[in-house]
A protein has these predicted regions:
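Short, Lys/Arg-rich, polar N-terminal cytosolic tail immediately upstream
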Residues: 1-26
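A structural signal for multi-pass alpha-helical bundles of membrane permease subunits
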Residues: 30-310
């Protein structure tokens, strides 16, 4: 009998393990219940519209399946490539400008402004352009650049710099620069806020060690601060490229895509296909192609700038 008892497995620890599993199971169920509303919201506002767009892109106006006909029509339209070139030029102007200006301002404030009150004031001022509705921004920009009553021409002529009106919205290259300047004004503060927050995470010990070794400000930025900012550049690039592909409001108000099609960006082109030419299938195909392009671009940028420090 004593031998049989000695050979029985120890029972210690079994009940605590079962209790731990039950506790984890309850926590997992609670987590799932908390996530259900969020997942349901995402499903309603993201998944369902995407599925409907894909369905519309492969059907005609009567709902009959047409395969890839709408995609072929969209890719075969010369105006699509005009819009693609205009969007590419717009991106080449606004993205480098916003990143360089935002980075310069973030470094300037980080190194020269030490008073918390002044930093908070600059933070509030930087947030203001981001909360202004794009339509309001477009209307104000129209008052600045419009011929006849534009404020910019009035100031230039009053200062004697020009003696006749400049058609800021009537010349293709000037019109592109005008709509790009509005985007730069509104979104450079976003870049500044993100990069300034990133600069606050740089270990002070690394900077002090570099200063002791005689490193210049450029060396500190290149080998220390830039290392910590790399994931944030990925974040900025992805969000800004996605926003460039959908920018609409101020371009529609300022130029309407003109002169000609010089400022007709992809979003404005899709709007015209849908609401002017009433070709919902082609517009849906373009929307799906833009979404695929954003996904591919995100994958490429992720490979180039790994998020090991994000």
């Amino acid at each position: 009998m004593s031998r049989l008892v000695a050979e029985l497995p120890a029972q210690t620890g079994t009940k605590p393990e079962r209790a731990g599993r039950r506790r984890r199971s309850r926590e997992e169920r609670l987590a799932y219940r908390i996530l259900v509303p969020a997942l349901g919201t995402v499903f309603v506002i993201v998944t369902i519209p995407f599925v409907l767009a894909v369905w519309q892109s492969i059907t005609d106006e009567d709902g009959a399946l047409v395969g890839l006909r709408n995609y072929t029509k969209a890719l075969g339209n010369p105006l699509f490539y005009d819009a693609l070139r205009a969007t590419g030029l717009y991106a080449l102007i606004v993205l480098p400008s916003e990143i360089l200006l935002g980075l310069a301002f973030a470094l300037l404030v980080h190194r020269l402004v030490k008073r918390p009150a002044l930093r908070a004031t600059l933070y509030v001022l930087a947030v203001l352009p981001l909360v202004v509705p794009p339509v309001a921004v477009g209307v104000v920009a129209r008052l600045i650049y419009a011929p006849g009553y534009g404020v910019l021409n009035y100031l230039l002529q009053g200062a004697g710099i020009t003696h006749s009106e400049i058609l800021w919205l009537g010349v293709p290259i000037l019109a592109m620069g005008s709509i790009a300047s509005v985007d730069i004004w509104q979104w450079t503060p976003f870049v500044y806020l993100v990069l300034f927050a990133g600069l606050q995470t740089v270990p002070r010990e690394s900077i002090e060690a570099a200063q002791v070794d005689g490193a210049t400000w450029w060396t500190q930025f290149r080998y220390i601060e830039l290392y910590y900012l790399r994931p944030l550049f990925l974040l900025i690039l992805f969000f800004r490229v996605a926003d460039v592909l959908r920018v609409f409001d101020h371009v529609f108000i300022l130029t309407g895509g003109g002169p000609g099609t010089s400022t007709q960006l992809l979003s404005l082109y899709m709007y015209r296909i849908e609401f002017k030419f009433f070709d919902g299938g082609q517009a849906a195909a373009l929307a799906v192609l833009v979404l695929v392009a954003i996904s591919v671009l995100y994958s490429l940028v992720t490979r180039a700038l790994p998020l090991e420090r994000a």
